[in-house]
Amino acid sequence: KANKVLIVDNKQLNAEQKEFVKTYFDNEVRHDIIPLMIENLPQLPYLRDKSLYLAIVMGNKTDAYQQKFALIEVPSRSVGRFIILPSKAGFTTIMLLEDLIEFNLPIIFSHFKFNQFDAHVFKITKDAEIDLDQEVGLNFIDKISKGIKNRRKGKPVRFVYEKDMNPEMLEFLIKKLGLNRKSSIIPGGHIHNFRHFMDFPNVIKEPNYNRPRPFIHPAFKKKMMVFDLIMQKDIMLHFPYHAYDPVIDMLREAAMDDTVISIKITAYRLASNSKVINALINAARNGKKVTVFLELKARFDEEANLEWKTIMEEEGITVLVGIPNMKVHAKLCVIQKKVKNKLVQYGFISTGNLNEKTAKIYADHCLMTKNVTLMNEANRIFNYLGNWEQGDKPIVKMRNLLISPINMRSAFMDLIEKEIQIAKKGYVASITVKLNSLTDTILLDALYKAVKAGVKVNLIIRGILTLKRTNEKNAGKINAISIVDQYLEHARVIIFN
């Protein structure tokens, strides 16, 4: 309201807006609406995981016994959830797609001659785990493929509904979904799927509310090849404050560079029309040896990654997939080229996905480097990924890179203990931890011990944090916060001072 932006439902429309909503529905939405008549079905049809649905009870005011049940999936993916309506000067009025559909229910169901419509929103969450141990006779790719298909049939584990839903409809849905645990049935408000608000129209005009455009890192303002810049010095990029272009440019340059021999890179989540993959395909076409470790177990990206695997292999790229009981979440790139008959390695170590779209909203760091030790160790990781059956010898004795589950926790424990000893000697000691989540009880116990010894501990945790409250005297205090702002905090940084 302070910015004159109003979100209205179908009961708050003026005459002009009502006409607009009817026309918009007819032109933009109607062809995506598929009503499901459900009251006589032995079981519910396939319902998408986490999609919004309208549960509709239709009847006549004159006949309380004549009613029908229907479901409509809200087509947020194809239409978009936020519709800007005509407004008076200086105001912006927005209507949610589910409310626009509810307004047009008399048109959708006109042939039933009903005059009373009761519609409420709900969504289900299905069991999304892919059990890779079940099908012993299948290879890894077949297991992933079968798991994706089985996910469609996954049992609902959570049912969130608008708390004013018609009681008969609510009872009907709970029974048909096979839900019997109260903890799985959650009443809520009118608005669900708040993640869609990441795509809320940018209608606020004040400059303070507009995201700044990513700016070019000063090093890249020089009209030089990315390789030449990295040869001069390491470059740390901070997304989304810095533009993601240098990462794409580095791969594109390598694809066209006659002296480049190979490109090795890991991939977890990719953009739908990935410029990264396009650059790698171009490199393969130009005769470079391109190796991509593609994590097929990236939750909800399994299907997309399987498609990318097929595309890349058809272009001659070597695609490595899957280590049992492990996800490869590292973001690494090693490029090898010949410079004056000497092998030179350069690339990057990053916290972000190889995704130029999410790089605009995820706060991440990327170190572009030619550092011999780091690149040698990164290359050893790729050697392990390609030959993991032969054991982890190549990566056990790393000196600089910390790798989970090999040496990361033990290294952190040693560093925490070092801060404890410094604090015990009366010096200032501190640890700052910035992570997506922190649930490792062994590390948390070490941090409790550190704080008792006088180490100042600051935690910046975006998601889950299993920190215990303590009433012990002289136990010290761990300062823990979560940053919620314009960007999604995605970086992993730990500072021992």
What annotation goes with each model-predicted range?
Residues 441:
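Active-site glycine- and acidic-residue-rich loops that bind
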Residues 456-460:
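Hydrophobic alpha/beta core scaffold segments
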